[in-house]
């Protein structure tokens, strides 16, 4: 028996993507990604991925050789704002943290996230 509800969900999502238009969606993701990259630079971080290999929907941030308390930052962000970002995984756990701007995120939602990141990071610099 196929998972009919999943097929309906997929159709709805594809319809919403097509209603926005692929080029518009790609441009929105690029704009949101540039907002995250500006935040990264503002706080003296660097992208983990080299230029040319960076995603437009997810930013992996280098942890400055382990000088930044990624686990503490993530915990404080969640406690204060109920926001969850990823602290990396496998070999890069703790030496990166990741911020997503994919899906249906908007300039407003990313700006809210940036404001929350700014609110918490002052305790970790």
Please give the residue ranges for each predicted region.
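Structural signature of PLP-dependent enzymes
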Residues: 1-34
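Predominant activation on well-ordered alpha-helical scaffold segments within soluble catalytic domains
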Residues: 5-15, 37, 71-74, 111-118
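PLP-dependent aminotransferase class I/II
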Residues: 16-22, 35-51, 65-66
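Small/polar glycine-rich anion-binding or flexible loop at a beta-alpha turn
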Residues: 33, 52-59, 90-98
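A short linear hydrophobic-aromatic micro-motif
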Residues: 44-48, 83-88
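Conserved PLP-binding catalytic core of the aspartate aminotransferase-like
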Residues: 46-80
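A common structural junction motif
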Residues: 77-85, 119-124
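PLP-dependent enzyme catalytic core of the Aspartate aminotransferase-like
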Residues: 91, 95-125
